[in-house]
Amino acid sequence: PQGLVTATKDAQHPTVLDLLRAEDRTPNTYPIGRLDRDTTGLLLLTDNGPLGFQLLHPQYHIEKEYEVTVNGPLEPAHIEEFQEGITFLDGTTCKPAKLKILNSSPKESQTLVTLSEGKFHQVKKMFLSVGVKVTSLKRIKFGDFSLDPDLTTGDYRPLNQDELQIIKNYLENN
């Protein structure tokens, strides 16, 4: 949820691990990846170090998909810019990304963005580079895992059998 830090501990802010019931926590539980404090959505937790490494390392090209709202219009030309790899205002270039414009108006646009890397504040910086600011950001997919529509913000659940099979297949093939 917004306002929580994606970390195992933080001296100034509550963390995503603070949401866990005591019986669901182990000393080695940690989040796979990060969400900014103002970002919501899907976050995987694990106590399996090799799995976490494989899901995060850029060489494995795990895609993450986000619902994004920005404060201005987007045009088809932006789709091409994302496909070619956005260059941040500081000169850093991102890997190609997929941009799907759901709707666009002069004051606000809704999109889906799919990335295969995770630079610091990447989605926000990508949109700033094309002249708009992110006003809402929600991760809805992480690889083959989708945000469970039955969960409310801040809720969690263990992986189901199908999802465990996805993990097993992933580990066997990588």
Tell what function each PLM region has.
Residues 1-174:
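Basic, flexible Lys/Arg- and Gly-enriched helix-loop patches that mediate nucleic-acid binding at interfaces
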